[in-house]
């Protein structure tokens, strides 16, 4: 694969950003952000969290989420990840948060979701799927800052009685 021997430089095509350029065939390889998609599944006043059975952050709690696949929309990916990780039955809601994580080249999207059952069948990436009231959330054991920020905003909106879309830049 030619990308193994690459140099980051301005391509000869007038581009204004440095790109990965193959030293052998001069092909420009565009490296773009990855989308992480998930949900905030809710049963009454409780949210569903998944305890990770994979790295990174093995054993930490997270919302059901993962990388978007080719051929699916953001919402389809979020629904798929929720089924795969939590084995949850739910109805998709509106987009709740969009978080730019430029440090790692990712954009995280979380949708609200209403659980239609409190029974879960987690997949192999999840040790345990469990419902938490706000005061029970293991805040210091959350896997990712985007999850913590999304949950914090979710509970703030729930207390206010009105949900809004949140756009956040995380350094």
Where are the regions a protein language model picked out?
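Unchanged
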Residues: 68-91, 95-153, 157, 161-163, ...
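Conserved small/polar residues in nucleotide/adenosyl-binding loops
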Residues: 1-5
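Short, non-ligating residues that shape and space the ligands of small metal-coordination modules
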Residues: 7-11, 31-32
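Intrinsically disordered, low-complexity segments enriched in small/polar residues
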Residues: 6, 27-28, 59, 109, ...
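N-terminal strand-loop-strand
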Residues: 17-62, 90, 94
């Amino acid at each position: 694969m030619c990308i193994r021997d690459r140099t980051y430089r301005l391509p000869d095509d007038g581009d204004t950003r440095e790109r990965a350029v193959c030293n052998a065939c001069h092909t420009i390889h565009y490296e773009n952000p990855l989308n992480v998609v998930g949900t905030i599944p809710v049963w009454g006043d409780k949210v569903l969290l998944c305890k990770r059975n994979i790295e990174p952050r093995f054993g930490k709690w997270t919302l059901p989420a993962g990388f978007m696949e080719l051929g699916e929309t953001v919402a389809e990916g979020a629904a798929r990840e929720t089924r795969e990780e939590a084995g949850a039955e739910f109805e998709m809601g509106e987009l709740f948060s969009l978080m730019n994580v430029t440090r790692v080249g990712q954009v995280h999207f979380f949708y609200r979701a209403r659980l239609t059952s409190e029974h879960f069948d987690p997949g192999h990436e999840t040790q345990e799927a469990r419902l938490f009231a706000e005061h029970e959330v293991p805040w210091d054991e959350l896997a990712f800052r985007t999850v913590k920020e999304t949950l914090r905003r979710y509970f703030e909106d729930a207390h206010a009685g009105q949900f809004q879309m949140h756009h956040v830049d995380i350094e």
